[in-house]
Amino acid sequence: MSAAKPTTLYDKIWNDHLVHEAEDGTCLLYIDRHLVHEVTSPQAFEGLRTAGRKVHAPEKTLAVVDHNVPTTDRSKPNPDPESAEQIAALAENARDFGVTYYNEFDKRQGVVHVIGPEQGFTLPGTTIVCGDSHTSTHGAFGALAHGIGTSEVEHVLATQTLIQKKAKNMRVTVDGDLPDGVTAKDIILAIIGEIGTAGGTGYVLEYAGDAIRALSMEGRMTVCNMSIEGGARAGLIAPDEKAYAYLKGRPMAPTGAHWDAAMRYWDTLRSDEGAHFDHELRLDAAALPPIVTWGTSPEDVISVTGKVPNPADIADEAKRLSKERALAYMGLTPGTKITDIKIDRMFIGSCTNGRIEDLRAAAKVAEGKTVNANVNAIIVPGSGLVKEQAEAEGLDKIFVKAGFEWREPGCSMCLAMNPDKLAPEERCASTSNRNFEGRQGFKGRTHLVSPAMAAAAAIAGHFVDIRDWR
């Protein structure tokens, strides 16, 4: 009898959840966990209501408000009627369909991809979906997680299944030790800079190597979070003792004999020696610098010690024109030193970098310093529990004393769907995940960086090399 064929982590999770495969490769996949927020769910719930259907597995569904909630005084009415309507609709739908729901006054409320792991709702080996593109965050725990559209949200609510076609496998190996000042955010920006925003199209990425294993769980979440910016369907990291330690004791995590049984399964969740990957990429962590994006795509990356590139050097006409447009939108001139670029705003938060370790890194930079008089800087914790922990550690006092605004949890300035927006041509150092035109506000200019880099820029008034920070 021949030995079983070596399989990847993605293959294992996929096969464990495959309900049916048609001749054309279309598959029906069982979904273990469904995260829901106020923006992509109203039509889905209304579809159920119209058809007279129930939520198939309410205990496997978790709802939270995050995109539209104000991060300032929540005792006042939401200033945007459409946002207020979506928030009210989610509360009503959660109540009517028996779904667990964290409203804006619940300390467990926060960005959906922060609260999932925080509550132990995210578990290794599970399939997780949400009507949000950054669902790949949960892959840090060895979960197969990706975003879905509103019609698919309704399908999962009704059936706890999803129609899919299997993606290909790509492994990204990052070996070596990260230099001081270089973070998980720089790793994923470097990867996107290497493969481009379409390089991962049709793939699920598995992140491996010494540098990935050395990351904390929060760092791993940052890496997996931006898999979609590289075009990938999802990102995965094999679970290990760090993942188990993070999850143990969380409110929704298994306990007792159930935990022990889960651990036995989780220990099988790694790619076998000799498993086939359709594409491989390797990076040397030791060679990575702190990174700043300069354009209007996450692939527009450069070292903080670099200069704004000249599109004239690009041979491909379509790409050259695209980069010329990006520079015009960003109001930048080729050859400008990155450290000479001044900022107007700073945002630390989002499902990419709104966790406690991110806030600690920023506070370390901010302590004893003062935000530049020309910069408005806001700190938005990823959840009420992150906010509570930060305040217990006194981080809020460090930020406020330095001149940063300390806010309530939510998606905030990551996207222009709430009161936290850039004015036209305002330039922002942001720890979020997208620097598209208008992402943070009409004609707003976004530069993606790590939390420490963002905090340092807010204090200096321009980008600085965090490795030189004193």
UniProtKB/Swiss-Prot annotation:
InterPro entries: 3-IsopropMal_deHydase_lsu, Acnase/IPM_dHydase_lsu_aba_1/3, Acoase/IPM_deHydtase_lsu_aba, Aconitase_4Fe-4S_BS, Aconitase_4Fe-4S_dom, IPM_dehydratase_rel_enz, IPMI_cat
Protein purpose: Catalyzes the isomerization between 2-isopropylmalate and 3-isopropylmalate, via the formation of 2-isopropylmaleate.
NCBIfam families reported for this sequence: leuC, PRK05478.1, PRK12466.1
Domain of life: Bacteria
Positions that bind [4Fe-4S] cluster: C351, C411, C414
Cofactor(s) annotated in UniProt: [4Fe-4S] cluster
Cysteine disulfide links: none
Biological process terms in GO annotation: L-leucine biosynthetic process
Keywords per UniProt: 4Fe-4S, Amino-acid biosynthesis, Branched-chain amino acid biosynthesis, Iron, Iron-sulfur, Leucine biosynthesis, Lyase, Metal-binding
HAMAP family recorded: LeuC_type1
Keyword Transferase among UniProt keywords: no
Natural source organism: Rhodopseudomonas palustris (strain HaA2)
Reaction(s) catalysed (UniProt annotation): (2R,3S)-3-isopropylmalate = (2S)-2-isopropylmalate
Pfam family of the protein (one): Aconitase
Protein name: 3-isopropylmalate dehydratase large subunit
Enzyme class: lyase
Family stated for the protein in its record: Belongs to the aconitase/IPM isomerase family. LeuC type 1 subfamily.
UniProt subunit comment: Heterodimer of LeuC and LeuD.
One Gene Ontology MF term: metal ion binding
